[in-house]
Structure formats: C-alpha cells, structure tokens
Amino acid sequence: MHKTPLEISLKANPDQKIPWRCAVCGFVFTGEKPPKGCPVCHSPSYEFIPEKDRQQLTYNGEKFDIMLINGSSHRAGNTGYMADLAEAVLRERGVSYRRFNLSEYVIDYCWCCYAVRAESCAYPCRNKKDDMPAFHAMLAASKAVIIVSPINWNGMSARLKVFLDRTTCMENLFHINKPGLTEGKVAGILVQGHEDGAIKTAMDIWLNFQQLGYVLAPFGIAFRTHGSHFNSVTDREFFQNDELIVRHTRGVVNNVIETMQLDIGEKLKGKLVPVTE
C-alpha cells in the first residue's frame, strides 16, 4: 500500500524527537512517535504527519495518466482505505498516477473573481500562493481523475468542495473563448460514508467535472455506506471486512483505465461544443 509520510519518517528517524501535526485539526505534538490520538479532534495516530516548513506544491511538467484524489479531512480514514483500494488497482494495471490526500495541502477558498467580471476568472488562477496552481497544471496534464469522497451532511467534504470551486478558472476558459484544457478527459467517482447521501454526493462531484468537459467512465460511480443505526466507531471494521467495497472500487478504477485507454480526448478534440453554466 501507499506509504504515508509518517511511515517514511519513522523508518528514517526511529529515535528522533520531531513535531507531528494532526492533518485534521492542526494540533502539533513533539516526540519520537505521534501520540496515540489527537487530544483536540480525537483523530487516531495515523492522521499525524511529520511537521516541517511548508513548501508550496509544484508540478514538474511530467505527463502522467491518472490523478487519484482523497477528498476527506481524514487522510487515513475510511475514505483513505477506499483510495488505498483504488491505488492498488492502478499499480496492478501499470498506469502512471499521482495520489493526493487533500488534507495534506493548502488550498484557499475561491476568490470568486468571476463575480467581478468574467474575464477576471482565467487560467492560470490569480491566487498563486497556495497549492492549487500545481493541481490545475496536473489536471491539465493528466488523462483522467478518480475522486474519492466521504459523505458529510449528505454532500462532499468542505475540503473537496473548495478544491472543486477552485477549478472554476479552468471551466471559465470556455466562456471567455480560450482553448479548454480538460474536455474529453475521463472521470471516476468513489464515495463512502456512515449513512445516507451517497448518490447526491457523487452527482454533486460529477456535475463539476461534467462542466469541465470530462467523460464519466461507464459504471464509473461506486458508493458504500454503513448505516445510521450503527455507532460510527464500527465503520472502519465494517468497511475493511466488506467484499462489496473492494469489488465495486476495483470495478470503477478498471473502467476508468479502460475508458482512458480509448484516447477519447484525442478523438473528440475540436469536435465538442462547450455547453457550461
């Protein structure tokens, strides 16, 4: 499975006291290992990552196939488990990919430049100080995206919503008569949660990518929920012993790969009529 920064750092510095930051709430603890749990938000120890001077995310320009995005505030929780399952298929199929847990990055809210005037919202984004410009460039460079999302109040997480809001500058290219960067790319959507809201969450996410010109892979959405009548503390055991979440996740990732390999984007180039809001 994907090695976390925590696991890599522990192996390299087994006895060194370092600061550990909770990726959920930002609490910092100093020690040889992270605490057993966060005293502020009660997240387990695997949500801690080694704290270091922040460096802005950059993109080296190297082309790759698929972006795998974990949109949960809990980088190693149940949504992270679903992302792990997806990542295993990507490795097995030998496609090039990059995985991102959004809680590890700094993504500011959208400035809504479009509300001032349409031409003010353009690519590259005017906010160049956070990690989103690199994400923009990778969305343009990759062939497909797989979004893994939790269900929060019958919708996606706030982190993922802000990420998707920040793709407005790419969508708006079609409105200001500039060449688009995303039409014909492929999308797949994976959703998990404690209770209801899976279909709505998936559709909210899909609407964003549809407006960017993405093509949803056939059978490109999968979701799994546990149930409100269970205590949420039992969710992790349920998901990690559930055969359906494994089968459906693997199916969606396979379908994204197969659709991507048809080179639909290249075949549709110059033939699409952008229809966006």
What are the language-model segments listed below?
Residues 4-14, 26-27, 42, 50-177, ...:
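N-terminal beta1-alpha1-beta2 submodule of the flavodoxin-like/Rossmannoid cofactor-binding fold
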Residues 176-222:
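Short, glycine-/small-residue-rich phosphate/pyrophosphate-handling segment
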